[in-house]
């Protein structure tokens, strides 16, 4: 019986790397971020709803959502963030559910890659939750380097989510990413072996 695993983490914990590794191990990944982009892609009903809620300035000359413009609005106006979520989330759920069912019907184990899994209380939609863990100090350091952010901005982004330590206590399994990529791969392989997804002797 194929399994549905919820994969989550925090900003800059290395979840995308784990997602890529799991694909290499034969899992099918359904990515919430990709689904969110599809939900408001050019020519979609979702994009028209964004235009109605945020005005013509929310759409670029190319007919796509102006992410920077909308991002600044929702960052500064919590009620607008809720409005955007009300537009995007139902469409995202529909897209992800369709992809998940398609893979399950083909007999694949499915990874639901959902950054805000706990924040949106989606743990009951999967068989178990795997969390990619690193320390908050490493999160902040990686974020500053990756996104060219100041210390204050990096901290603000990290602290806008449930803390990674609290999430680790809520998850079924924690994938340690305190070291380098090779150590991360070894930690993931160990989990997959323990869970019976792969046979190391093979």
Curated annotation (Swiss-Prot):
Q: Which domain of life is it from?
A: Bacteria
Which stretches make up the DPCK domain? 4-202
Give the matching Pfam families: CoaE
Kindly indicate whether the keyword Kinase belongs to this entry: yes
The record lists ATP as bound by: 12-17
Q: Which GO terms describe its molecular function?
A: ATP binding; dephospho-CoA kinase activity
UniProt main location, coarse: cytoplasm
Could you tell me the keywords of this UniProt record?
Answer: ATP-binding, Coenzyme A biosynthesis, Cytoplasm, Kinase, Nucleotide-binding, Transferase
What EC number(s) does its UniProt record assign?
A: 2.7.1.24
* Metabolic or biological pathway, per its Swiss-Prot or TrEMBL entry: Cofactor biosynthesis; coenzyme A biosynthesis; CoA from (R)-pantothenate: step 5/5
Among the GO biological process terms of this entry, one is: coenzyme A biosynthetic process
CDD domains named in the record: DPCK
Catalytic activity entry: 3'-dephospho-CoA + ATP = ADP + CoA + H(+)
Q: What GO cellular-component annotations does this UniProt entry give? A: cytoplasm
The places in or outside the cell where this protein is found are: Cytoplasm
Q: Which PANTHER family match?
A: BIFUNCTIONAL COENZYME A SYNTHASE-RELATED, DEPHOSPHO-COA KINASE-RELATED
As for family, the record states: Belongs to the CoaE family.
**Role:** Catalyzes the phosphorylation of the 3'-hydroxyl group of dephosphocoenzyme A to form coenzyme A.
Entry protein name: Dephospho-CoA kinase
Species for this entry: Staphylococcus haemolyticus (strain JCSC1435)
């Amino acid at each position: 019986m194929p399994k549905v695993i919820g994969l989550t983490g925090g900003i800059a914990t290395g979840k995308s790397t784990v997602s890529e590794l799991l694909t290499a191990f034969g899992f099918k990944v359904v990515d919430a971020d990709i689904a969110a982009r599809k939900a408001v892609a050019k020519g979609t009903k979702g994009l028209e709803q964004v235009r109605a809620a945020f005005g013509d300035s929310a759409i670029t000359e190319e007919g796509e959502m102006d992410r920077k413009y909308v991002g600044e609005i929702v960052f500064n106006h919590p009620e607008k963030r809720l409005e955007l979520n009300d537009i995007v989330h139902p469409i995202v759920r529909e897209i992800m559910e369709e992809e998940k069912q398609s893979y399950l019907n083909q007999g694949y184990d499915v990874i639901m890659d959902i950054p805000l899994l706990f924040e949106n209380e989606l743990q009951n939609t999967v068989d178990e939750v795997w969390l990619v863990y690193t320390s908050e100090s490493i999160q902040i350091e990686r974020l500053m380097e990756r996104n060219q952010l100041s210390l204050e901005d990096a901290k603000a982004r990290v602290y806008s989510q449930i803390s990674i330590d609290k999430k680790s206590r809520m998850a079924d399994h924690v994938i340690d990413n305190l070291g380098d990529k090779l150590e991360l791969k070894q930690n993931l392989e160990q989990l997959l072996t323990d869970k019976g997804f792969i046979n190391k002797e093979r």
